């Protein structure tokens, strides 16, 4: 057997970054990486450290800072978010033990899900509550239905893309039956579905953080996840969002500069997160994800005998993830290079006269995508020049009356550009009838519209 290189006492169970680890040393290795990020600057130190009276503040001020230091953890029940929560729980326990019951921060956990998966998700959350019962006063759980995205007190809108000039027309929509499921059913492919779902989940999470005055959102993204997101954003025409996506040092300007986004797992590979979850027994809490055994000497995951998912059926994120999964073992430095390079990017120069946000994803539009697309594409139909072409067109019109009527209607309707980014224009291009039912953003309404949660039974009662 190989001996652990850290403690030099126990047998190694896995190898990471070409170094053999025993279980105990590896858990400490991963935990310290997250805790190092938690102390990365003064803002996060003020959140996670216990405040005591000093020359600058009295006892009351110190206690208030400890009480107000609350963070939100979006829990997808994948390995990365489970690991982030587990390390926070261990940190709280250590603070209680070493500071006579005091802690420096509070944690609230939010899980977004659909109605179809609610019962399974609720069961997983109940198990987690039981596991972390020693911190039941410091860790609170919330489950929110993803259809709360449309259950808001302000108007819905129907956004239509006109392919001949890439402009968008918006009409008010009072459709009470609009749901996330119906919107996804109109999406052209898995990449578009994933893109829209990511926008919906992100908005719900950040809205929750804004309403409840959280200091930070702790996103459970590994280094591998961040790398595949950098590549995917680039391919999907959302490269301008990379700088903001990886920014842990600024308050979120799109949500009233109320909180910071934070990625405590940005120095840890997904395979390392999976190994941590297996050692700590967190695999039982995962949902729609199988913890992998990539780093372990003794394998425990049944490998499929054939490639189940074809490349043509994969989303852009899945393709990027597959690539990084394949190189993690021998070329993990490529993953860290992608993340470091993305973190060095800054926001593009704004070429518009004002700050404009995309009506769909809320990203800042730095350059008019309509003008850019108009310069590189030919979207208008070829002009009819002779009798033969006119005869062919009339024959097509007679054979396709519905399409012809729709085409004429779209051509006659004046287009109005309401501000949609290039990435969302790409998504709209493939939507059914190039239409999308969406919310009309209103900052004041965002603050007053409280998200409704599913009820989770307390520890001492059943509901």
UniProtKB/Swiss-Prot annotation:
Its main location: cytoplasm. Signal peptide: none annotated. It is found in: Cytoplasm. Pfam families: CTU2 (PF10288). GO terms for molecular function: nucleotidyltransferase activity; sulfurtransferase activity; tRNA binding. One of its GO terms (biological process) is tRNA wobble uridine modification. GO terms for cellular component: cytosol. Pathway: tRNA modification; 5-methoxycarbonylmethyl-2-thiouridine-tRNA biosynthesis. Keywords: Cytoplasm, tRNA processing. SUPFAM superfamilies: Adenine nucleotide alpha hydrolases-like. Plays a central role in 2-thiolation of mcm(5)S(2)U at tRNA wobble positions of tRNA(Lys), tRNA(Glu) and tRNA(Gln). May act by forming a heterodimer with NCS6 that ligates sulfur from thiocarboxylated URM1 onto the uridine of tRNAs at wobble position. Prior mcm(5) tRNA modification by the elongator complex is required for 2-thiolation. May also be involved in protein urmylation. HAMAP family: CTU2 (MF_03054). Belongs to the CTU2/NCS2 family. This is Cytoplasmic tRNA 2-thiolation protein 2.
